[in-house]
């Protein structure tokens, strides 16, 4: 059985394993107050060219989104997101459970359009009853999106301008950020994200780490007592060094970007194979997530040897499935998948 089910099936990159083994019995102070976390933060600041950034390490994506959004928003505020955004669809109501409404907008290939955001905000404040409504207090996007698509630099700049006009933060979910930045023809860099986004996080769980996400507040805008708020959300890891060592390793010698490229290269080969086999793509994703419509009978046969991820039904006899590559995907497994297809 080979797996293309997701990009978090493997453990961690070998260099992370080596570093963790080295420090395993060192006796390191807790809660992220250690030299490894500080070193990782400084390396991330350098990668973002954002020396004033405040950085915090959390364990997982949904936990990070809930903690950040709940800590930044007032009790009467909600967060604008695409109807297909992770916070709106695959986080089990985590944002709503913390008391905030997800204000959904239509998506185009997984992305919210700057014009739609501007129109929503304009209409909200033009409504004479808006004091009786949930205020839009943040714009949430992910890069890559749920469909593996990417924002352009121009789109990020537009969204940033709109958010500044209405004095609300632009928050970018970077669970798969490395894979988005590794695409050859993208015009978005880590520096651009730090420039245009008020808050973003760098995903480790899906990009080479055992677990961990690095939250970056780019404009000295972290909520007061944010560590306390992290703790309040049950998200503060006592062994914080475990995350610090991993991110310190990922941001040494450009390892984060080097291993991200493997996911893009193996995904490109997989797309070639799928095209050769005559499969229809549900959406044109340039990153490591590939969405294909398959006949249910063919899918049933494929799943005897390959794990893939269910996405949605298109009709009674067809299903959209997702193939995901990662930093750890072996090209030989891609070729083997081609035999099963």
For the regions a protein language model found, what residue spans apply to each?
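Catalytic PLP-binding core of fold-type I/II PLP enzymes
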Residues: 151-183
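Conserved C-terminal alpha-helix-loop-beta "cap" of PLP-dependent enzymes
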Residues: 74-76, 268, 275-341
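PLP-dependent aminotransferase-class I/II
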Residues: 99-137, 141-144, 151-158
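Conserved N-terminal alpha-helix of the aminotransferase class I/II PLP-enzyme fold
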Residues: 13-60, 83-88, 94
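Hydrophobic beta-strand scaffold residues
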Residues: 102-103, 170-172, 281, 308-310
């Amino acid at each position: 059985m080979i797996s293309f089910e997701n990009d978090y099936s493997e453990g961690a990159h070998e260099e992370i394993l080596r570093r963790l083994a080295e420090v395993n019995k060192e006796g390191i102070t807790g809660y992220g107050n250690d030299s490894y976390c500080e070193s990782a933060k400084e390396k991330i600041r350098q990668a973002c060219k954002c020396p004033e950034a405040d950085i915090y390490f959390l364990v997982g994506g949904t936990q990070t989104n809930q903690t950040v959004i709940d800590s930044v928003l007032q009790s009467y505020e909600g967060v604008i997101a695409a109807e297909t955004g992770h916070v709106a669809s695959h986080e089990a109501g985590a944002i709503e459970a913390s008391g905030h409404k997800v204000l959904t907008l239509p998506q185009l290939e997984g992305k919210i359009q700057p014009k739609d955001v501007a129109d929503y905000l304009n209409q909200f404040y033009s409504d004479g009853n808006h004091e009786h409504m949930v205020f839009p207090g943040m714009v949430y996007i992910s890069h890559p999106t749920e469909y593996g698509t990417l924002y352009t630099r121009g789109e990020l700049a537009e969204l940033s301008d709109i958010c500044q006009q209405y004095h609300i933060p632009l928050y970018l979910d970077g669970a798969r950020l490395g894979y988005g930045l590794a695409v050859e023809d993208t015009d978005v860099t880590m520096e651009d994200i730090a420039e245009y986004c008020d808050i973003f996080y760098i995903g480790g769980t899906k990009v080479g780490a055992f677990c961990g996400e690095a939250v970056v507040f780019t404009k000295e805008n972290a909520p007061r007592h944010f560590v306390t708020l992290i703790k309040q959300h049950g998200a503060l890891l006592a062994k914080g060094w475990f995350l610090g060592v991993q991110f310190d390793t990922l941001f040494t010698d450009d390892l984060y970007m080097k291993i991200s490229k493997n996911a893009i290269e193996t995904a490109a080969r997989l797309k070639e194979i799928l095209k050769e086999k005559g499969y229809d793509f549900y959406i044109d994703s340039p990153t490591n997530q590939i969405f294909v419509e398959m006949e249910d009978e063919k899918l049933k046969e494929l799943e005897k040897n390959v794990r893939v991820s269910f996405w949605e039904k298109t009709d009674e006899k067809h299903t959209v499935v997702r193939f995901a590559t990662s930093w750890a995907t072996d090209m030989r497994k891609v070729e083997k998948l081609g035999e099963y297809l």
